[in-house]
């Protein structure tokens, strides 16, 4: 029997690469990303980070300590164009600069985006300064998110929250119930409704909500995916996921 050595031919990197750091207990974020980017020429990779419950500032900071390790394991020794940290309250708790530093320790050439910073960019792009804020968090964590948006210069016209303490419970909120709850939000004086948390099933109902409420609706995942696509220059408009994606 003859054995023949054949030289392989390797592809060169062509599509932009997205690396998502998803919370281990998040049901929604991967699905939302895939639903938006499935017809685009991008490569999408995911690694999960341990989430500590209950969701408190202290536990969210503790979670962020593993960001470098988790980032490193997304295609080790390969470049990623944009690393996405998939936690709104976690970014607010730890601080964007801290998250960015930890990501770049593993992927120094990568762009970095997070839900909270992406939300600010999206609101500014749409010239929105007054928002109604909805979160699924505990009262204490809800208030920390509220203060973050205030400190970024936004007026909060109303605020509602679920008072859920565990991330895996947030992902189990019934989508139809959520639509009904958000449909009744007090929007007096608001230019938009922002719904926080990557684990809530908001993105699939955003179009319907905007029609029902006759106002702009933004969510953590929507803003995050939009900003990711902006960073990799793939942000052409897309139907079905709210006004933000139609404004590109």
Residue ranges of each PLM-predicted region?
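C-terminal functional extensions of proteins
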Residues: 218-248
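Hydrophobic alpha-helical
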Residues: 179-209, 225
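Glycine/small-residue-rich loop that forms an oxyanion/phosphate-binding "nest" at active or ligand-binding sites
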Residues: 70-115
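Conserved beta-alpha
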Residues: 99-106, 110-167, 245-246
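Periplasmic-binding protein-like
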Residues: 80-86, 132-133, 190-197
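Short, well-structured alpha-helical segments in soluble
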Residues: 64-78, 177-190
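N-terminal glycine-rich anion-binding loop in soluble enzyme alpha/beta folds
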Residues: 2-69, 137-142, 146-174
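Hydrophobic alpha-helical segments within soluble ligand-binding/sensing domains
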Residues: 66-68, 72, 112-127, 222-234
């Amino acid at each position: 029997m003859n054995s023949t050595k054949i030289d392989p031919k390797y592809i060169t990197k062509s599509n932009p690469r997205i690396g998502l750091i998803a919370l281990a207990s998040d049901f929604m974020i991967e699905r939302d990303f895939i639903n938006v980017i499935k017809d685009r020429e991008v490569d999408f990779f995911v690694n999960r980070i341990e989430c500590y419950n209950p969701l408190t500032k202290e536990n969210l900071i503790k979670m962020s300590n593993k960001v470098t390790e988790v980032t490193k394991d997304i295609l080790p020794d390969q470049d990623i164009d944009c690393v996405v940290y998939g936690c709104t309250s976690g970014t607010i708790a730890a601080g964007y600069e801290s998250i960015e530093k930890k990501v770049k320790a593993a992927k120094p050439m990568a762009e970095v985006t997070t839900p909270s910073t992406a939300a600010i960019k999206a609101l500014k792009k749409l010239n929105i300064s007054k928002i109604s804020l909805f979160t699924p968090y505990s009262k204490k964590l809800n208030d920390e998110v509220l203060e973050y948006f205030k400190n970024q210069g936004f007026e909060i016209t109303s605020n509602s929250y679920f008072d859920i303490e565990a991330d895996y419970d947030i992902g189990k909120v019934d989508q139809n119930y959520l639509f009904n709850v958000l449909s009744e939000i007090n929007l007096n004086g608001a230019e938009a409704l922002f719904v926080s948390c990557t684990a809530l099933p908001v993105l699939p109902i955003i179009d319907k909500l905007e029609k029902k409420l006759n106002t702009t609706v933004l969510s953590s995942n929507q803003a995050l995916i939009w900003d990711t696509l902006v960073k990799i220059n793939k942000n052409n408009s897309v139907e079905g996921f709210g006004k933000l994606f139609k404004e590109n």
